[in-house]
C-alpha cells in the first residue's frame, strides 16, 4: 500500500478526523455510582488519534464533529483547543436545552485498581454528531488543495 502525501504548502492540515468527541467524566479512584465529584476531559476514538498526532509529532490537525450549541459544547471545544487541535470544522447544532433536539455525548470511566478492571459507560443517545449529515460539512472544500480554493489535507 502506497501512502499518498500531498505537498505541505498545498495543505492547511496534515490530518483530520471525523467522529464523536464526548465529555469524559472520571471519578478518580472511586466508583461512578458513588462519586460526588468528577474530573472532566475530552475523548473519542477518532479524536484521540488526531490529538496524539499533534502532541507527539507536532502535526497540524483538525477534528470534524458536531456539538450541541450550549455551554457543554463550548467546554468541549475549549478542551480540544487546549489539546492543540483545530476546531474550525465543528458543526454547531441547535438545542432546546433539554436534549430533545440534540445533546453532547457523555462518557463515564472509572479506573481499574488491583484486580478490579476499568469500567465505563457512555450516554450517547440523540447526540449532535449522531444527527449529522454529509451536508453539514463541506468535504470538497476541506479536502481540496489550497491552490484549488480548499483547505487541503496531506494524508488521504
Show the residue positions of the predicted features.
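Conserved N-terminal subdomain of the carbohydrate kinase-like
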Residues: 60-156
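A short alpha-helix capping/helix-coil boundary motif
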Residues: 27-31, 54-60, 147-151
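Alpha-helix C-terminal capping segments
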Residues: 41, 48-60, 82
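Residues at secondary-structure transition points
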Residues: 37-44, 71
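Positively charged, low-complexity intrinsically disordered leader regions
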Residues: 1-37
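Short secondary-structure boundary/capping elements
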Residues: 14, 41-48, 133-134
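Gly/Ser/Thr-rich beta-alpha loop segments that engage phosphate groups in nucleotides
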Residues: 21, 45-47, 154
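A generic fold-level signal
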Residues: 10, 33, 44, 101-103
Amino acid at each position: 500500500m502506497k501512502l499518498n502525501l500531498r505537498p505541505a504548502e498545498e495543505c492547511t492540515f496534515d490530518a483530520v478526523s471525523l467522529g464523536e468527541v464526548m465529555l469524559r467524566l472520571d471519578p478518580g479512584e472511586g466508583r461512578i455510582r458513588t462519586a460526588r465529584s468528577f474530573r472532566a476531559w475530552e475523548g473519542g476514538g477518532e479524536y484521540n488519534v488526531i490529538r496524539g498526532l499533534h502532541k507527539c509529532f507536532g502535526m497540524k490537525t483538525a477534528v470534524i464533529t458536531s456539538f450541541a450549541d450550549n455551554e457543554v459544547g463550548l467546554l468541549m471545544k475549549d478542551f480540544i483547543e487546549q489539546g492543540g487541535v483545530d476546531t474550525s470544522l465543528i458543526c454547531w447544532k441547535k438545542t432546546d436545552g433539554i436534549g430533545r433536539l440534540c445533546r453532547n455525548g457523555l462518557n463515564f470511566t472509572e479506573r481499574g485498581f488491583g484486580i478490579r478492571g476499568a469500567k465505563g459507560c457512555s450516554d450517547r443517545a440523540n447526540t449532535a454528531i449522531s444527527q449529522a449529515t454529509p451536508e453539514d460539512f463541506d468535504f470538497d472544500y476541506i479536502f481540496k488543495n489550497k491552490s484549488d480554493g480548499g483547505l487541503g489535507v496531506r494524508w488521504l
